[in-house]
C-alpha cells in the first residue's frame, strides 16, 4: 500500500472517531484474503496469475489498513461473493456481481457502531431480462449459416428467469474461458470429458465407484469449483451433497496413490474445494466489532 494513501485513511478514520461517526470503507479491490485460504493450492497448481491471487493483499498490507483505522471494508471488481476476516480485526466483504452465476448485491444495516448486519439479495426475477433474446437468436443463426460453431449454448434462450439465464452464462464462461485459460493441459486432456467413475478408475483402479458417478464428468466438477469460488455460500445449496461426497472420494483416492502431474493437480483441486466449502458466513451475517466475530443470521 502507498504510504500517502495509508496516511489519508488514518486521517479520515481519526476524524470519524473524533466526530462519533461510523466509518465504512469501499474500495475497488479487496483489503484481505478473498479466496478462503486457497491461494496456496492455486499458485502451486495453476500459477501466480490465476483466480486473481495477485489481488490478494499481503498480511502486512491488510494489517496496515486495519491499523490505519479500517475495520469493515467492502470490495468489488472480482465478481466474488465472500467474507474475509483478518488480523485483529478487519472484515472484508466482497460484493457479488449482478451477472454472476448467482447474481446479487449486499445491503448493510448499521445497528450501532459495533454491530452491523449484512444481507445478500439475490436476483431471480428481473423484468424484461429476455427482451434481447430475439437478437441473440439471430446472432446464433447467423453463425450457423456461416458454418461457425456458436460459442454460447442455445439453451440459454429457454431460460425461465434471470437466475437460470445467469447459470447458462456462467456454464458457457467456464467452457470457453475458464477451462482453456486456467486449467493445465494434463487436466483438460485426462479428466474434462471423463465421467466420475472413469476418473476414479484412472486414479485408483481398485476403488469402488457408485453407478451415479457416471452421471457427471470432469467438466461438471471444475464448473462446480468455479461456482463455489465465485458465489460461495450462494451456490452451495445448488450442488447436491451426494455429488460433493463423490468428488471427495476422488480427492481421497488421489491422496493414497503415488504422485504424478495428474495426481498433483487433483490433490490441488481437492484442496481448493475444501477451502471454498469452509468459508466464513457470506450470505446473511452479523459483524460484531466488539466481540471481533462474524456470525451467520
Language-model region placement:
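Short, solvent-exposed aromatic-acidic interface loops
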Residues: 119-130
Amino acid at each position: 500500500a502507498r504510504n500517502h494513501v495509508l496516511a489519508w485513511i488514518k486521517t479520515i478514520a481519526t476524524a470519524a472517531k473524533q466526530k462519533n461517526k461510523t466509518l465504512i470503507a469501499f474500495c475497488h479491490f479487496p483489503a484481505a484474503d478473498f479466496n478462503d485460504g486457497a491461494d496456496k493450492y492455486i499458485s502451486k497448481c495453476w500459477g501466480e496469475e490465476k483466480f486473481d491471487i495477485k489481488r490478494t493483499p499481503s498480511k502486512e498490507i491488510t494489517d496496515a489498513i486495519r491499523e490505519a483505522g479500517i475495520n469493515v471494508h467492502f470490495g468489488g471488481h472480482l465478481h466474488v461473493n465472500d467474507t474475509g476476516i483478518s488480523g485483529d480485526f478487519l472484515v472484508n466483504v466482497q460484493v457479488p456481481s449482478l451477472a454472476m452465476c448467482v447474481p446479487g448485491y449486499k445491503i448493510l444495516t448499521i445497528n450501532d457502531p459495533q454491530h452491523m448486519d449484512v444481507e445478500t439479495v439475490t436476483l431471480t426475477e428481473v423484468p424484461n431480462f429476455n427482451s434481447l433474446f430475439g437478437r441473440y437468436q439471430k446472432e446464433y443463426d447467423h453463425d450457423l449459416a456461416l458454418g461457425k460453431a456458436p460459442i454460447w449454448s442455445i439453451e440459454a434462450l429457454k431460460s425461465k428467469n434471470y437466475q437460470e439465464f445467469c447459470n447458462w452464462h456462467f456454464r458457457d464462461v467456464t467452457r470457453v474461458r475458464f477451462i482453456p485459460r486456467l486449467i493445465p493441459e494434463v487436466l483438460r486432456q485426462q479428466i474434462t470429458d471423463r465421467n466420475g467413475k472413469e476418473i476414479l478408475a484412472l486414479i485408483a483402479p481398485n476403488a469402488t465407484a457408485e453407478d451415479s458417478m457416471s452421471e457427471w464428468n470432469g467438466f461438471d466438477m471444475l464448473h462446480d469449483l468455479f461456482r463455489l469460488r465465485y458465489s460461495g455460500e450462494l451456490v452451495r445449496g445448488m450442488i447436491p451433497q451426494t455429488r460433493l461426497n463423490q468428488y471427495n472420494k476422488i480427492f481421497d483416492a488421489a491422496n493414497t496413490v503415488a504422485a504424478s502431474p495428474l495426481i498433483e493437480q487433483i490433490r490441488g483441486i481437492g484442496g481448493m474445494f475444501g477451502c471454498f466449502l469452509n468459508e466464513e458466513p457470506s450470505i446473511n451475517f452479523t459483524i460484531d466489532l466488539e466481540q471481533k466475530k462474524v456470525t451467520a443470521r
